[in-house]
């Protein structure tokens, strides 16, 4: 049994841990709270200064079926799950923790997705949000935390075509 050490080993680990489609994208978030103001999250990449680098995101909005699983007419209210971002522990960890424990309103969470060439192609914008949950995990490839945001309004923007859709809950 051999142990691979160094950058090449990390690259191989990243390739085996992340699904192929995830490797094609990068993501950052701009976060502005009501009392703390814009969070300076430490990204130093040119044009992305102060943003939060993300490792992943997930969200879900469901329209339940009136007849339960398996079909039928849609019935009932939309079921909206929090948007969850995965990030490393960093300088934005304490302000997000304070936002959670103080129930601080978050004016804006703007998630920007970039393709493999670094072109900003999609934006998810949350307004009037709250940090609903923070969970931390220690894994073999590092320390990460999941931050779940509930929100009043969401906007989806295709930056290439200009198409957008929004909804208030």
List PLM regions with ranges.
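Glycine-rich, low-complexity intrinsically disordered segments
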Residues: 21-169
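Bacterial N-terminal signal peptides
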Residues: 4-19
């Amino acid at each position: 049994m051999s142990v691979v050490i160094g950058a090449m080993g990390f690259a191989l680990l990243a390739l085996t841990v992340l699904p192929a489609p995830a490797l094609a994208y990068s993501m950052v978030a701009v976060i502005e709270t009501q009392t703390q103001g814009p969070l300076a999250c430490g990204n130093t990449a040119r044009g992305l200064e102060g943003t939060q680098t993300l490792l992943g995101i997930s969200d879900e909005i469901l329209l339940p079926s009136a007849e339960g699983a398996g079909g039928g007419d849609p019935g009932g209210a939309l079921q909206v799950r929090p948007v969850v971002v995965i990030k490393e522990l960093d300088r934005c960890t304490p302000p997000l923790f304070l936002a959670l424990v103080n129930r601080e309103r978050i004016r804006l969470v703007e998630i920007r997705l970039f393709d493999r060439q670094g072109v900003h192609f999609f934006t998810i914008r949350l307004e009037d949000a709250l940090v609903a949950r923070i969970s931390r995990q220690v894994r073999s490839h590092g320390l990460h935390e999941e931050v779940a945001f509930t929100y009043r309004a969401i906007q989806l923007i295709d930056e290439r075509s200009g198409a957008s859709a929004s909804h208030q809950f």
